[in-house]
Amino acid sequence: MRGPVHLQIEHQPVLDAALRAELIGIWVDATNAGGALGLVAPTNRQAAEALAAPTWTRVEAGHDDLVLGRRDGRVVGWCVLESRGNPLSPHWRSLKRLQVHPDVQGQGLGRALLAGAEDVARRLGLTAVHLTVRGGTGTESFYTGLGYREVGRLPGALRLADGDDRDEIHMWRDLGAG
């Protein structure tokens, strides 16, 4: 049996150029290792930076919350709690881009990062978290095992390539459920 996973969770760290570069590096490496994170492998820094730019702007403006995990001082994973910007849904956010660097995957760090993000969400007064996963990856079983439930599916909503359309699976977790 594996011992406890030690991951230092940081909420809203200063998003300077060095940290941005680190986060983009993790994103590119995780995508190229098979991660379903909004890009299609093979990808590069330029593609990730273009997709990340609006996120960085929203984090810096205080609309969204960056959560990252450090192990022995090194950033090994990150995610964003994205605000809906809707006055009818201030009680929940969407969890976006949960990722752990491929060279430390399989050590429980993804679970630890998710638990840390959920703790941040609770401290923000949120009562639920929503996320989406790409169909055909098996990722939904990871989240189901951690208390998330499928609440909807958009058939063929994600086009990875001609002839390769995947479902976008929506999942939900009531944060009061433990």
Model-predicted segments: where are they?
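Conserved GNAT acetyl-CoA-binding A-motif
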Residues: 114, 121-134
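Actinobacteria-biased recognition of intrinsically disordered, low-complexity terminal regions
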Residues: 1-5
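Helix-turn-helix
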Residues: 139
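Acetyl-CoA-dependent GNAT
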Residues: 7-97, 101, 114-116, 120, ...
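Conserved catalytic-core motifs of GNAT/GCN5-like acyltransferases
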Residues: 130-134, 144, 149-167
